[in-house]
């Protein structure tokens, strides 16, 4: 298949057994498909088209789906397409994605492409792309190839701890996507990830020290875009899990999931306002593996994990649980103003890293533009598929 080819997805709608929510499967379980990394902007402004990845004919490419008809246009071709990297610019003009070490900008109308940045020889690009609100700038992490763990990170979790302990030389690069210029913001011997430019303000970059919770020094870090003001946002003892930090849409606070593995075993959503830099407990929550915030900031969504073992420590060689036991593998909605959690639907993910990318079965829920639906991924009915649940 080639760019601009069209595939047709057959939708299947059902009522969730446990909540009665209407859920529509958008892709079919005979092949792997998933949406982009769940912090990315992967829908057009009118909410009618969705960017996702599908593995067909042995390769993964990006597709743009009409969520009313199921028709999807192939947007990329060739090898090395980073299948979680795609995003649509705020003005709906361009598709941004990474292919190998090249960062591409594609005109959605004409299909014309240009490379606006390429990682230098000896370094590798990885992880997530962190754009500014206006999509003029982007932050990424580059890693010196000869400093990483010997085993490849990504296909499964085998090298997760190994790469953390290797303390690879990583750097945060700040890219001007319009001018094609770049500069190094920060560099250190530590596995870095999840760079996110502060919304609205654009003056800071949130990032993490990556790796198992009991091996890292602290996960949450922030730095000014000029490279000054490196700050650890929160100390982290080795028995505490902090995960999936995200800027609130107004850029005023960083939110994240806090989970104790000893003691009271508290699990809640916490925030750090930039005005005070002091942690606040927002509300208790179910055991989210990931969570996200609606563009309006009025709602949050999380994918609960029905077992206590961290995802990277699961035995992924085990077959999918077929006992029929229903654990707390549900999608939850949070009303931010009411600080109330509502069970939306069962995602039933196996959480297994067996399909080629360790993230493939992760639900990674996110809201549609109007906050009337939540889209997520799960292998509930076969290989990972895209689902859309009514809110």
How should each PLM-predicted stretch be described?
Residues 237, 280-292, 339-366:
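Conserved blade-ending motifs and adjacent loop-strand segments that build the rim/top face
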Residues 283-342:
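Loop/turn-rich, solvent-exposed surfaces of beta-rich toroidal or solenoidal domains
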């Amino acid at each position: 298949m080639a760019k601009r080819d069209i595939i047709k997805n057959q939708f299947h709608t059902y009522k969730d057994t446990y909540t009665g929510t209407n859920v529509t499967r958008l892709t079919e379980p005979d092949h792997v498909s998933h949406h982009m990394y769940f912090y990315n902007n992967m829908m057009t402004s009118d909410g009618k088209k969705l960017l996702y990845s599908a593995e067909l004919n042995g390769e993964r490419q990006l597709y743009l789906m009409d969520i009313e008809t199921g028709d999807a246009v192939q947007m990329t071709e060739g090898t090395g397409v980073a299948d979680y990297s795609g995003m649509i610019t705020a003005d709906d003009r361009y598709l941004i994605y990474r292919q190998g070490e090249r960062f591409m900008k594609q005109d959605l109308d004409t299909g014309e492409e240009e490379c606006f940045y390429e990682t230098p020889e000896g370094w590798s690009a990885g992880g997530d792309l962190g754009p500014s609100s206006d999509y003029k700038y982007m932050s990424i992490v580059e890693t010196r190839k000869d400093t990483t763990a010997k085993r490849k990170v990504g296909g499964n979790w085998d090298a997760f701890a190994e790469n953390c302990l290797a303390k690879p030389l990583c750097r945060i690069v700040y890219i001007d996507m319009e001018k094609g210029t770049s500069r190094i913001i920060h560099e250190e011997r530590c596995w870095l990830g999840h760079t996110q430019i502060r919304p609205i303000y654009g003056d800071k970059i949130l990032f993490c020290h990556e790796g198992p919770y009991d091996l890292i020094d602290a996960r949450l870090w922030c730095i000014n875009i000029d490279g000054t003001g490196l700050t650890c946002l929160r100390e982290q003892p080795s028995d505490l899990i902090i995960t999936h930090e995200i800027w609130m849409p107004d850029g005023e606070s960083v939110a994240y999931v806090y989970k104790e593995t000893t003691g009271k075993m508290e699990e809640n959503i916490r925030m750090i306002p930039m005005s005070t830099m002091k942690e606040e407990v927002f509300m208790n929550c179910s055991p989210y593996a990931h969570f996200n915030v609606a563009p309006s900031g009025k709602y949050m969504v999380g994918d609960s994990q029905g077992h206590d073992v961290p995802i990277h420590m699961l035995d992924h060689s085990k077959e999918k649980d077929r006992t029929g036991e229903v654990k707390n593998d549900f999608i939850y909605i949070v009303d931010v103003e009411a600080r109330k959690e509502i069970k939306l639907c069962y995602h039933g993910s196996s959480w297994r890293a067996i399909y080629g990318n360790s993230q493939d079965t992760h639900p990674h829920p996110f809201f549609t533009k109007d906050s009337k639906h939540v889209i997520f991924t799960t292998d509930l009915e076969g290989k990972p598929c895209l689902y859309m649940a009514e809110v």
